[in-house]
């Protein structure tokens, strides 16, 4: 239950609630001894009772408290009161970049303003990296701006709440993995691999992409699709979203590279390249190679860690994906049923499914359906309805096809792409041949191969497979 205004908690007097989330609430509170107001984050009792999380929370709060930088929200104290962990931080009286986008720049912020914000955050991140600390959750919601309409406004990076040491084997877990994080997380972070400062650089680049265009690089109502795109899809060209930003295409191609070694070594290198191409203050030689931030060699990857973290994180996301998949196939069945009646017209209202911070609008099913857990029950008590050849995540998960057959999330041979298949483990390259529709432009191999897998395994036509995969993946 949220704390009431005027009540006391650990000596702090609650002024008002600032926000809430899955792990707890944040309050504006008066300090018990000093004449100031702070931001007090209070975790839920059930989260606080988790022994492993408690130890990690204390360790990471201590790590965040060691940072002292003009662009980092300071951590002052931590503790426990009535079975709930809490952390005391600076209160930033202002806004965040999510609010700026929503209220002022729904189609993207001006280049010079983005350069200023990204440069400030990049300096803060490199400062932390030099001290062997990673943020792990860089996104627009964590970039705060104090006095946003003043010439002396301050740009600050908040919530080192899942910060950790470079060689810390914890960090990304189901407890702190959110849909918002998925939109900006680096491939190696999503896979539970070793991390260094280049994971934060990837997230910073995804954040810059969002600030400039009004939406993140990869967006889909199904978070499992977003994850698959981070892992296997080519970085989107920002010029395709905003033509006047075409000069930034090579900058984002490098910053959003799948392999850390192909990215900028430091966050400020990315910020300089961005500023130079936008015509602001930046590095005139944005191709030069800088020395990477010096950190201790990370610990060897733990197979147990990967085996536990990745399924735990993405099982949560798969639950959210179930409802989307069910609605898509219900809509597909209705469309097929309507095709023989050429004069029949169906009108339905639009529904919006949000993946923070962007949204995707889709037609509603023509047959009334319920949402949430009820959608899951519509397909099967334990599995989602899936399309053979469609993107899936996590590897090894199972689903049910529209015919009732069991489908497996498997790797397509010779790629890092995971698709639904009637066979387990690796999906062999399809041997079936298909004549392309003469009215259709040739598809890239990463889209063509899954279609042929579908044809080979289900016996459906190329058009049927293409349409089912297109709907499931959200392709145009």
Curated annotation (Swiss-Prot):
EC top class, as a word: transferase
InterPro entries for the chain: Kinase-like_dom_sf (IPR011009), Prot_kinase_dom (IPR000719), Ser/Thr_kinase_AS (IPR008271)
Protein role: Phosphorylates the FHA domains of the ABC transporter Rv1747, the heat-shock protein GroEL 1, and Rv0020c. May play a role in the regulation of glucose transport, cell growth and septum formation.
Annotated keywords: ATP-binding, Cell membrane, Kinase, Membrane, Nucleotide-binding, Phosphoprotein, Serine/threonine-protein kinase, Transferase, Transmembrane, Transmembrane helix
Residue intervals of the Protein kinase domain: 12-279
Disulfide bonding pattern of the chain: none
Phosphothreonine PTM positions: 8, 13, 173, 175, 287
Gene: pknF
The species this protein was found in: Mycobacterium tuberculosis (strain ATCC 25618 / H37Rv)
Residues annotated for ATP binding in this entry: 18-26, 41
PANTHER family to which the protein is assigned, alphabetical: MITOGEN-ACTIVATED PROTEIN KINASE KINASE KINASE 20-RELATED, SERINE_THREONINE-PROTEIN KINASE NEKL-3
Subunit structure: Interacts with Rv1747.
Family statement drawn from the similarity comment of this UniProt entry: Belongs to the protein kinase superfamily. Ser/Thr protein kinase family.
Protein name: Serine/threonine-protein kinase PknF
């Amino acid at each position: 239950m949220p704390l009431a205004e005027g009540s006391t908690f650990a000596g702090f007097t609650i002024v008002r609630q600032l926000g809430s989330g899955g792990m707890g609430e944040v309050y504006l509170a008066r300090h018990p001894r000093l004449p100031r107001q702070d931001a007090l984050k209070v975790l839920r009792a059930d989260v606080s009772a988790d022994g492993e999380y408690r130890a990690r929370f204390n360790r990471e709060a201590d790590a965040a408290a060691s940072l002292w930088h003009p662009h980092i929200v300071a951590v002052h104290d931590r503790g426990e009161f009535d079975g709930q962990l809490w952390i005391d931080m600076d209160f930033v009286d202002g806004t965040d970049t999510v609010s700026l986008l929503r209220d002022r720049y729904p189609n993207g912020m001006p280049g010079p303003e983005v350069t200023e914000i990204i440069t400030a955050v990049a300096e803060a991140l490199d400062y932390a990296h030099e001290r062997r600390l990673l943020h792990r959750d860089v996104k627009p919601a964590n970039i705060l701006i104090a006095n946003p309409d003043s010439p002396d406004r301050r740009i600050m990076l908040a919530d080192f709440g899942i910060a950790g040491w470079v060689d810390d084997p914890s960090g990304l877990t189901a407890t702190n993995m959110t849909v918002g994080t998925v939109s900006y997380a680096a491939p190696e972070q999503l896979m539970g691999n070793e991390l260094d400062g280049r994971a934060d650089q990837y997230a910073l680049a995804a954040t810059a992409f969002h600030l400039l265009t009004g939406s993140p690089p990869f967006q889909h109502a199904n978070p499992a699709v977003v994850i698959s795109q981070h892992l296997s899809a080519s970085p989107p060209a920002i010029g395709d979203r905003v033509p006047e930003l075409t000069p930034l295409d090579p900058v984002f191609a490098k910053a959003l590279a799948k392999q850390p070694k192909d990215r900028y070594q430091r966050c400020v290198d990315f910020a300089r390249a961005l500023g130079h191409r936008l015509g602001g203050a930046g590095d005139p030689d944005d191709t030069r190679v800088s020395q990477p931030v010096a950190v201790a060699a990370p610990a060897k990857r733990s197979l147990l860690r990967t085996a536990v973290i990745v399924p735990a994180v993405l099982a949560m996301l798969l639950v959210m994906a179930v409802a989307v998949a069910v609605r898509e196939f219900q809509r597909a069945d209705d469309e097929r049923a309507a095709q023989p009646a050429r004069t029949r017209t169906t009108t339905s209202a639009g529904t919006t499914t949000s993946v923070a911070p962007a949204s995707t609008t889709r037609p509603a099913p023509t047959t009334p359906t319920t949402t949430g857990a009820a959608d899951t029950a519509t397909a099967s008590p334990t599995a989602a309805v899936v399309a053979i050849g469609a993107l899936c995540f996590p590897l090894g998960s199972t689903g049910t096809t529209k015919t009732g057959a069991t489908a497996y999330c498997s790797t397509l041979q010779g790629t890092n792409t995971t698709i639904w298949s009637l066979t387990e483990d690796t999906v062999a390259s399809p041997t079936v041949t298909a004549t392309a529709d003469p009215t259709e432009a040739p598809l890239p191999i990463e889209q063509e191969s899954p279609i042929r897998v579908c044809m080979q395994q289900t016996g459906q036509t190329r058009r049927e497979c293409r349409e089912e995969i297109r709907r499931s993946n959200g392709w145009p």
